Amino acid sequence: MRRFGEITETWNPVIGCLHLCVYCWARRLAARLASMRVQPYAKRDFAPTLVPWRLDKRFSKRSFVFVCDMGDLFGDWVPREWILKVLENVSRNRSTSFLFLTKNPKRYAEFDFGDNVVLGATVETNRFLQGISRAPQPPDRLEAMASLDHEYKALVIEPILDFDLNEFVYWIRRIQPIFVVIGYDNYGNRLPEPSLEKTRELVDAVSEFTEVRCRTLREAWYER
């Protein structure tokens, strides 16, 4: 069984996203890079884009690579051919580990993945959301991850939004992730987030059956 530690590097052969999440740091970073004339952002900003010169990147055997942290590779708008090009390099680097992360995990079922891949989903809450994102609703993401037949799965609950403790824990347990990342918004967006006490209850409950990797844990903005 593979061991997956902390991310050691990122790889962005495809950039851009159309989910329009209100808290998206990557979209703001892309705009800043575009203003500095950094390619491909200077030409494309945050529009979905294949970056051909990044496709054949080589990786060390011990790396754990976060694929496409500047976009959603599995968004419905991404051509299948782009994804296959990315997976070709993943399959060539069997000794390197890769993390995919999406808000559209139902699309994972369209592709084959090796045991050097962790399939992740960002799921901020178990509840339906309004005015936060155009991504598939969190309950749909949870269902897709629970149905996914892959040995290594992960969940990212960041930025965490208010949730129903028992139901959320039920879904996380059903998904059987090898690790769960939990953290608050870092950019002052005043999201509908849970109290720190409630988040700690979630951390404790999930820690009983899988690894929890805590990021920013703080009082909710309305508790300060």
Give the residues covered by each predicted segment.
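Conserved AdoMet/S-adenosylmethionine-binding subsite of the radical SAM
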Residues: 46-210
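N-terminal [4Fe-4S]-dependent radical SAM core
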Residues: 1-66, 72
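Small/flexible residues
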Residues: 4-5, 34, 39, 46, ...
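C-terminal accessory extensions appended to soluble enzyme cores
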Residues: 210-224
